[in-house]
């Protein structure tokens, strides 16, 4: 018996006698079966033609020892992924433009009002001496 076979049989016998914590042992426990299959699979000679290996390093046709855990999702599932980054800046940019547009419109309307009032006052002040002079001249005639 080789050293590898002795260690394999020792590991297999220790796994059979052990019971997983927190649950009862049932016949054909999947975890121990997967480990034992994995240990038994190492017995084959890697140079033999029937022992072809795949890219991942395991033999073709042998089941892997990995397990997939599935969980039921709640009815109202909110994904953890963020929305596409292209959508957010457009909305933000629109909001910013709208805000600046409102403020700019207010500034223009108030500014135009003050400019008109200022021009009217300037025109009245500018034309007042001539108006007075004209009325005085026409009165003197």
From Swiss-Prot:
Membrane topology: Single-pass membrane protein
One Gene Ontology term, aspect cellular component: 9+0 non-motile cilium
Disordered: annotated segments: 1-94
Keywords, alphabetical: Membrane, Transmembrane, Transmembrane helix
GO biological process, alphabetically ordered: regulation of response to drug
Compositional bias per record (Acidic residues), positions renumbered to this chain: 30-47
Transmembrane segment boundaries: 115-137
UniProt-annotated location(s): Membrane
Domain of life: Eukaryota
UniProt cross-references to Pfam families, sorted A to Z: RDD1
Function text: Regulates drug efflux through modulation of ABCB1 localization and activity.
PANTHER family registered for this protein in UniProt: REQUIRED FOR DRUG-INDUCED DEATH PROTEIN 1, SI:DKEY-126G1.9-RELATED
Name of the featured protein: Required for drug-induced death protein 1
Biological classification of the source: Eukaryota, Metazoa, Chordata, Craniata, Vertebrata
